[in-house]
Amino acid sequence: MNFKFFPQTKEEIEQMLKQAGMNSLDDLYADVPEQIRFRGEYDLPEPMSETEIRSLFDKLGEKNRRLTVFAGAGCYDHYTPAVVPNIISRSEFLTSYTPYQAEISQGTLHYIFEYQSMMAELTGMDVSNASMYDGSTATAEAAIMALASTKKTDTVLLSASVDPKVLNVVKTYAHFHGFNVELIAENDGATDKEQMDARLEKGGVAGVIVQQPNYHGIVEDFSGFADSCHAHKSLFIVNSVAADLALLKTPGEWGADVAVGDGQSLGIPMAFGGPSVGYMCCTEKLMRKMPGRIVGKTVDNRGQRVFVLTLQAREQHIRRQKATSNICSNESLMALFVTIYMSVMGKEGVKEAAQMSYDGAHYLHDALIATGLFSDKYERPFFNEFCVKYNGDVDRLQQRFIENGILGGVKVDADTLMFAVTEKRTKEEIDKLVNIAKEEKL
């Protein structure tokens, strides 16, 4: 047999087999049924030199089309300061795990503590955990948290204006955890509070989940939502785009019990749907029900400041069925990413990026409406994302955008496009998109 793709030599393989008390590789694979074993030669290319491999992948990379992004729907093209990937690429940071021996990992615990502090401030909440996988799983975990925090409940309400991808993840959790998911209808693209109140009156609701801005880009008015939930012993849970909270009213200001969402908008580049980081914050009252790691600050026996994994009995040193969650890792590296991003940008920088995104989106919206080719899908305020109806062929228009190097929005139904704008988009790029739309109709 030819072992040219194995790092071990034939002699080394024979030595390892002998040590294991075997005579051949067939003995090693004896547990694998004969009918599914591969026989014959592998269809692999001949070995290449480093320069040949680099040339091959350069040619493959040239096939990629780089587009100017005006699409969002949960993943946004924000700018990443060069220092961020430079720092997180250090070997000390390249892990997604929080440490098991906290006392010897003070640096890691320190940056997680800073992340928690920043997210708690950004959301206006008391406590943050060390991160979740992404915004969808954070929302689903919040639903379970609501069920664990309330009595005689078996249902979680979600606004129909929540991102469908988030809704699907919550439904998956619900199927295996045995709780019900019910939708609150929309009224002109926003949560229908009257329907929510009517359902709360029937009882059995552990929590209500809304999104801000919602999937349509609308900035909703949640006045009275928390009061309605609390009057019926239910939790009020707000899912938000993290970057937008630099300017918007925070979940804490809306009276939320739990704030969740995706941190991708805090400078994490888009790459085939990831990586990302989910955040989860809550009130101090609910802290012991919150899943995931929590890093705390204390002093050692010499009076020196130290960081520790606190309240571990909630989710690790406990029987599985009693744990707050069975998630045993997190997105520590991406939590570090957004921590460095917010540190480098500073409060004013994060606010400025959000303001530029808001201004750019409203400039694009007004320019599209002015063409006479587009009309508003909803008559409601929006932040940096909005839905407009197009009075032509949406598919053809999107193809024209792509031909001109633009990813022009997300098609949400037969005649509607949803556009998103971030601080990366220039006036020239926005004007180019509008002009392409005009030319398409000529």
Predicted regions and their residues:
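Compact, charge-rich alpha-helical regulatory domains located at protein termini
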Residues: 1-26, 30-39
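N-terminal entrance/gating region of PLP-dependent enzymes' catalytic architecture
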Residues: 32-113
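Gly-rich Lys/Arg/Thr-decorated short loops/hinges at beta-loop-alpha junctions or inter-strand turns
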Residues: 91-102, 120-125, 151-153, 174-182, ...
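Short loop-beta-helix segment that forms the pyridoxal 5′-phosphate
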Residues: 100-104, 121-140
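Conserved PLP-enzyme active-site core in the AAT-like
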Residues: 107, 137-304, 373, 388, ...
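Buried hydrophobic packing segments
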Residues: 116-119, 123, 139-146, 278, ...
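Conserved C-terminal alpha-helix-loop-beta "cap" of PLP-dependent enzymes
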Residues: 205, 348-433
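Active-site C-terminal subdomain of aminotransferase-like
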Residues: 266-372, 376-379
